[in-house]
Amino acid sequence: MERAKLHIDELNKTFKISHTNKNMRKSYQFQLTMAKLGQLNDVDDVNEQMKQVAEYSDVLIDFPADVLNLTDKQKEALDEMEQDKLQELDVTLALKIQGMSNTQIADVIDSMRDSEHGDADSKSEK
């Protein structure tokens, strides 16, 4: 598998993505965490909901920091990003690790954006 690259504007740096088993496992774990967050409405306990959201916010930084071997300063730069943009970065990274093409990744990101707008539209209709 050809080594993919990922440019992060906020860090002004391009990273080579390794398709190692270790990184694959981390990408699957990240996606599992995202899926659990998607089921948050099924959790009745508000404290548990907030705990899961807080943990997810940490994962958004920890996943790319671990895979890309980021410095503390680079992690801080990611922490200053808008959450939606950081989530897109993480999804892109996970899918690049898994060998998806840029076109496939763009389709996934577009679908995420459409889903978010759909959720906002349905909430505004209430």
Regions flagged by a language model, labelled:
Residues 1-54:
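Short N-terminal mixed-charge amphipathic segments
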Residues 72-126:
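C-terminal charged interaction modules
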